[in-house]
């Protein structure tokens, strides 16, 4: 029975540019979450993909957030500059070019953390400097 439904059970993938156009046309439709499964560190990917971030910038999307992007170089740069300061970044895309090129621009350092937090389980071991930056 499942075999007969296999085509109906396939995910409907949409180009991120089309999603951004839809979201920008319907800003009051509620929260939109983009999940880039191809850059999932739980599956062994580097977690430094910039495709979604670059699409948000290109679409002039307001209110977007990239949850996690592994970039120790930019985190160190943000920590050196301090909260409230602006830094010139080359964010993400440093492991390879499969998940997007580095995003270059000015970024405001919003907040910093030393990476200490409570988590039970094998993940997140060795997390160090964290930063929240706003790309302009």
Where are these regions (language model features)?
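Active-site catalytic microenvironments in core metabolic enzymes, especially phosphate/sugar-handling
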Residues: 1-4, 8-26, 30-33, 37-131
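Conserved small/polar residues in nucleotide/adenosyl-binding loops
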Residues: 133-135
